[in-house]
């Protein structure tokens, strides 16, 4: 044992520091500055600052004698044992079973048992201490220091085990992808069939709902509903609806309310698909508020209660719906020439679509044929003068299939058709200043300004 530890380089302080310094605090601090070549042999306990011996004269003999005294001390086997336990605690993997070195073999509890066994064995053979009290104090302090290191290493291992356990538990509870992998192990084929069937049924149901909504809107306003291009974009967009739902489900955090849902809703959420009832409710709200498809916070809360989803899921669904459903309808309307102005969130112009069951600005009801509608003095209605008798529009109306008048932007000052929309038929713009009737002046003074509000 002594030869083994003599060859190891784990004790640089023991080789470079005389043992007599551990009995006196002042002596210990003073001797820490001496190098290996200046070490003095082991001496008496009452000495002060030791005078180092000249190099090469008895230094090797003194070091060897000090090492022999340390290796021959009764407590040295216990010191070597706790040192090995500290090494095992830092270089070996942890295992609670203790089936290999590095498990509970290097724990502090096992070291307590080793101390008891060692003390029992040593007392029967020889005393625990030697005749040198300074060496005894050195051995006891070294064992205590290593004991403290072992306790701290055990605390670090406990913290690591606790963190790993909590991290794995958090991953299992927060990530639905783990649940999807578990489901695929047993029923991957059935899940794929259910997913395909739900996509097909959702697409068919959405198309039928759109047709019913189209017929209802046409009967109410006397105008056709969305064009075939809009329906094509609707049905073509249903295939991407499932991907949006999956993104929303993964992005939304799970809450404790999931425990109160039934098994079917849990299964649907595991696969990232919203229930059909929830999708239909949000889609119905979207088409009822096409003029302003931005639900307020209260409306989001109400929709979340009606659909059984979270507010974040409802919000994400409407973001995707505005991008994938509303925007293609607007683009199709602009391409086919049904709307004179691009879409704005306030619903200033949506082409030939009827929104919220009210007449659109561009649709002409029975009444004056030269103006875009029979506006009344409502708080949201803008003032407008009436043209003189015999006035006919200078721009021919649209085809009978569309049946809506020119855009309101034609009545704004600066528009290319502004002068022709104000002047009577057959008049030219250069007659505007020289030949104005009172009715023309009234009409010119009360042009519509939709940007005033």
Swiss-Prot record:
One of its GO terms (cellular component) is cytoplasm. InterPro entries: HD (IPR001356), Homeodomain-like_sf (IPR009057), KN_HD (IPR008422), PKNOX/Meis_N (IPR032453), TALE_homeobox (IPR050224). Transmembrane segments: none annotated. Residues 102-185 form the MEIS N-terminal domain. GO terms for molecular function: DNA binding; DNA-binding transcription activator activity, RNA polymerase II-specific. Gene3D superfamilies: Homeodomain-like. Keywords: Activator, Developmental protein, Differentiation, DNA-binding, Homeobox, Neurogenesis, Nucleus, Transcription, Transcription regulation. Residues 267-329 bind DNA. In early-mid neurula stages, expressed in a single stripe in the neural plate. By neurula/early-tailbud stages, expression is localized to rhombomeres r2, r3 and r4 and the anterior spinal cord. Some ventral expression was also detected in posterior rhombomeres. Not expressed in rhombomere r1. Signal peptide: none annotated. The keyword Transmembrane helix does not apply. It holds the Pfam family Homeobox_KN. Residues 218-242 have a biased composition (Polar residues). One of its GO terms (biological process) is positive regulation of MAPK cascade. Its main location: nucleus. Residues 37-60, 206-272 are annotated as: Disordered. It is found in: Nucleus. PANTHER family: HOMEOBOX PROTEIN TRANSCRIPTION FACTORS. Belongs to the TALE/MEIS homeobox family. Caudalizing protein which is required to pattern the anterior/posterior (A/P) axis during central nervous system (CNS) formation. Inhibits anterior neural expression and acts as a transcriptional activator to induce posterior neural gene expression. Maintains a proper A/P balance required for hindbrain formation by activating the FGF/MAPK pathway, which modulates the planar cell polarity (PCP) pathway. Interacts with retinoid signaling during hindbrain patterning. This is Homeobox protein meis3-A. It comes from Xenopus laevis. The gene is meis3-a.
């Amino acid at each position: 044992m002594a030869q083994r530890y003599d060859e190891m380089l784990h004790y640089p302080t023991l080789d470079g520091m005389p043992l007599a310094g551990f009995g006196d605090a002042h002596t210990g601090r003073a001797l820490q500055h001496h190098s290996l070549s200046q070490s003095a042999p082991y001496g008496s306990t009452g000495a002060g600052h030791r005078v180092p011996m000249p190099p090469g004269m008895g230094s090797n003999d003194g070091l060897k004698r000090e090492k022999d005294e340390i290796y021959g001390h009764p407590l040295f086997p216990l010191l070597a044992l706790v040192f090995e336990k500290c090494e095992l605690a830092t270089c070996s993997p942890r295992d609670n079973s203790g089936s290999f070195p590095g498990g509970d073999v290097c724990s502090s509890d096992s070291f307590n048992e080793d101390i008891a066994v060692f003390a029992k064995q040593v007392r029967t053979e020889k005393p625990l201490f030697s005749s040198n009290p300074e060496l005894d104090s050195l051995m006891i302090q070294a064992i205590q220091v290593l004991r403290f290191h072992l306790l701290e290493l055990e605390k670090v291992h406990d913290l690591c085990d606790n963190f790993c356990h909590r991290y794995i538990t958090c991953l299992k509870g927060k990530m639905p992808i783990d649940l999807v992998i578990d489901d695929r192990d047993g029923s991957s084929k059935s899940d794929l069939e259910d997913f395909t069937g739900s996509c097909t049924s959702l697409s068919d149901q959405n198309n039928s709902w759109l047709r019913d909504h189209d017929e209802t809107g046409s009967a109410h306003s006397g105008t056709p509903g969305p064009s075939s291009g809009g329906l094509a974009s609707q049905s073509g967009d249903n295939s991407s609806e499932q991907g949006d739902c999956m993104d929303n489900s993964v992005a939304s955090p799970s809450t404790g309310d999931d425990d109160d849902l039934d098994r079917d809703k849990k299964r649907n959420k595991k696969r990232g698909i919203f229930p059909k009832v929830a999708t239909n409710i949000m889609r119905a709200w979207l088409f009822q508020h096409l003029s302003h498809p931005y639900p307020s916070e209260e409306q989001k809360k109400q929709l979340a209660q009606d659909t059984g989803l979270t507010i974040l899921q409802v919000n994400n669904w409407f973001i995707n719906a505005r991008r994938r459903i509303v925007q293609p309808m607007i683009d199709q309307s602009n391409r086919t020439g049904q709307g004179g102005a691009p879409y704005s969130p306030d619903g200033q112009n949506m082409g030939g679509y009827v929104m919220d069951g009210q007449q659109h600005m561009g649709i002409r009801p029975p009444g004056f044929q030269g103006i875009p509608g029979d506006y009344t003095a409502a708080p949201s209605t803008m003032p407008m003068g009436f043209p003189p008798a015999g006035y006919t529009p200078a721009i021919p109306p649209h085809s009978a299939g569309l049946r809506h008048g020119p855009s309101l932007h034609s009545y704004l000052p600066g528009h290319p058709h502004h002068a022709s929309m104000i002047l009577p038929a057959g008049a030219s713009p250069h007659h505007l200043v020289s030949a104005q009737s009172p009715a023309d002046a009234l009409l010119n003074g009360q042009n519509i300004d939709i940007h005033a509000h």
